[in-house]
Amino acid sequence: MKYDAVCVGNHDVETGHNVYDRVAADLKANGIPFLAGNAVKPDGKPYFDSVRILKRHGVKIAILGFTNPNMKAWLDEKLWTGMQFESLIPLVQNEVDLISAKEKPQVVIVAIHSGTGKGDGTIYESQGLDLLKSLRGVDFVVCSHDHSAVVVQQDSICLINSGSRAQNIGHGRIRLALKDGKVLAKSVNADLIKVNADRVDSKMEAAFHSDYEAVKKFTLREVGDLDIDLRTRDSYAGMCPYMNLIHTLSLSAKSAQVSFAAPLTFNKDINAGRLIYNDLFSIYPYENQLFVVRLTGDEIRKCLEYSYDSWINTYVPDGHVLKIAEGEDQRTGQKNWHFINRPYNFDSAGGLVYTVDVTKPYGSRVCITTLADGTPFSSDAWYNVAMTSYRAAGGGYILSKGAGIDTDNMEDRIVARHDDIRNILYDYIQKSNGIHAAEINDTQRIGHWEFVPASAAQAIDKDMTLLFGE
């Protein structure tokens, strides 16, 4: 592809040192820097490259690259040993000033694996608009991560986010008037170019054909039977087979008494029948490990209160139970209904018997009575709670803001670290010869929870119709 530079993303770091260190070396051997100027070693120097200086048509260009500063909230520390991740503000401006003074580039591009965000300084993982508003001496901010396809121009700087899945190419244009190497005038603009999936590059297709076929063969192999339909959207209305499966997997961890889990696929149907390996990516799309963490009963309740507060409103007649709003879809431009908050942070609990009263305010909705086996639940007792590595590291702020737990110091609370959850799913299917409704819906194992009062069900159904149609 002959890239001039590549930025490190959180899913690169997720692969671990063995992979991304090799990728960095391979890229470097081909003259391509792997950029992440805010991933710093204990001595303060960048772990990866931080800048690329190049010339095009006599114009000197500086490309500064940075990655997401929120890595610690998603990934286990063993994946990023030897580095820390600094906030992009004020670091990016400081680095721009240093490079501009030293190299005197005529064009400056800041490429970040960070989302567009809201521009109000509140979203640590998405600082694109924050940078657009504050940076000086920069022509383009190229961002990513949150899959929002958008171009924003402010004064003499453009933000470009091409979205996800190679559906668009971000296209920035700059017009310069130069005299004796000095910039007399400059203008920038940008747009997004739709990728035509029918126009295949035959050389690229040939180069990757054997790799494609190998992956295809692996993902199409049969792995077991599914005797019940799984619909991920059912997770938002209460207990459902899909979430029951995820809780069953989590509670299979040795010593786990309770599990926290959220739907990681927003709206997907996995129909009963013969499963292929590729279906496992629909059931569990991310590379999260399973951790077991010690929490008190009171902390469990507070975590659930925080989770459900991002998920539901305090219901009033003719209002919405689900915390939804109508707005424009950034990907399609069409108006639709959507959750205000990220559904992948809508944790419910397995292994407990509890209710969530939608008529009560935050802090008094969740009433836990027993464990799944009937043992009385105590606010003062300690429990082993299975959760993703993302959640244990502070992702979604459920532990920190919900229960006041210091997620920077979790080591004393972590009881066990297990394999990636998709691998646990695969092993479960092999051991159980498939996924069977009787096993995953066993309330003696996964417990039971529901929204109350029962009269709220009709309002929830209306909200679900707004979100997903009839």
Please place each PLM-identified region on the residue numbering.
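Catalytic centers of hydrolytic enzymes
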Residues: 74-83, 87, 94-95, 163-470
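Acidic, metal/ion-coordinating pockets
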Residues: 1-197, 237-249, 259
